[in-house]
Amino acid sequence: MNKWKTLLALVAVSLLAAYPAHSAGDPFAIFDDIDAMMEDNALMEASNRYESIMLTFFPERATLLGFESANTQLDTRTPARDQAALLALQSLQTAIKEMHGEKFSPAKRTDYALLKARVNYEIWQLNRNRLTTDPLYYTQAYDAVYDLLLKRLSLQARQNEALSARSAALAQTATEARQNLKAPSAFLAQLAMEKAYYAYLAYEQVSHRLQTQAQDDLSRQDAVKKTNIARKNLKNMFEYFKALSQQEETPDFRLGEKDYLFVLQNKYFITDSPSALRKAAQRRLLEARKNLQEALEPFTVSADEEAEIITEDGSAPVKKAKKKKRNKKAPLPTAADFYTIKNRLALDASTNNILFSIAQEAQNAADFLADRNAVKAFKGPFNVQALPAYFAYMQAYKFVPPYGAQNLPTDDFFVRLPTGNALAKHKMAVQDLNPSARKLMIAGELVPGRYYKSVQQNALGGIRKRYGVPTLNNGWSVYAQHTAQEAGYIITDTDNLFLAFEDYRRAAAAAVDVNLHLGQFSYADAMTFLTQANGFEKEEAEKIIKSATALPGEALSYPVGYETLKTLRQKYQKKQGARFNAADFNARVLGIGDIPPAQLSKALEDAYKNKK
């Protein structure tokens, strides 16, 4: 008996030592802290359960969480797998609901909200029965194969083994698609067909790697056989999706109001009503067109409207544009006006040492922005690589943060390199890498954009780092471009024009996202809105609509995230006046992580209180 009394006394003393603040107050308050510790531990256990579910049922995503054992597998897309995964997630959802959120430590309440929403979203995805309705569900397997080309995940031989295994598993994915899909949306089938085509064309890169790195002739012959089979499966899936895309009467590809609002709330933490979403989209579009009008002004001054300025030192006179009076009755510009001016500009771009030069320019930008007190000093190096062909068919560049618990975590930025003959290479370089486009890319994706942001957030806790809200992450990319403009990195008239157009494109894409999935736009309505009302080229309009279809809510998250950051920045600038330090503000924001936008204000307030 005395032994137990002594043990309890020691426990009490140790707890009091850990929480000295309570010793002078309520002695029973210590048990509140114990409750908080227990709830925090329960949250960590729930997070571990979620990762275990990913590893068991969704190996493609487990790879992105850093689980090397998942790299040789693709998801099994069958009703039995979905039912088992659903039961596991529902059990976890119940456990999360039973937690006492009010007892969490303040730092964990946000993590709780992130994990809870994540599980809700996973369950919603399974309940949509994408097995039978969504061809894009199967093309995620292509992403999983090519994801292995983006990171050095393990020993080279083991990584090639994983690449070979996933390539071989594409046959099973093709079989599952044919067995499960029942009259899916023709438009979704078209998008799947395009991805299958890109995967087929790009597979030569996988085939070449596996064959050239084979250890002996026998292994090389085996690699040739397996890669030929994989290419055949990709071609067969392309033909199958093509046939599905030609069906006449198919289900609607739009989410509809209920599901769209669910996605916004549980993936992006955007909680506005449908009417508020539509009004905000209209407001942003109007503001973007006004800003584009202002950015176009330097390019719309004719020779007759330029004034000759005689310099005092006797050097040659220069022409300076007169300040034009804005015609208030003139219609606001559209994308067509931007295209007209862009075609007049003598844009150029070098194709020499592209990767090295971008990395060097990023470091120069980091030094410049640090000197201007826009960001904290940052010494790279910036890891810039060639974008694998599969992704290059769909985008000009791609930033990839570390894969979760990756053994040797790396931040990687991939750039599409120009291909084809000399003329084609030059044309692609001018499109993707002209000086102004290059600056926007560096500012938004490298520094102070996603790359810089990811490195600064390496110390964040597991839940917040792995399951952060896309809204602030995407908004930061826009905020980074405007920060670079404010600091004088994006400075020329052409730079400002390109940024104004990019903002306009984002506003138009968000408007399509909202109106498409709320049922206000059909595909034809969206095309008319983009091409006729807003002057976008048909190819660009198609990209916007396809992106909104494949990733509902993503386009909207950019302006919402940016406005959240911009509003808080303005608040602290006004509050602190001359004491405001932009680099310090940005560092505090990044130190918080990608939390729900509505919680950022309070979290930032606490960050200022705790780090004075």
Model-inferred region functions:
Residues 19-23:
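Sec/Tat signal peptide C-region and signal peptidase I cleavage site
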Residues 1-8:
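Bacterial N-terminal signal peptides that target proteins for export
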Residues 24-612:
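N-terminal maturation segment of proteins
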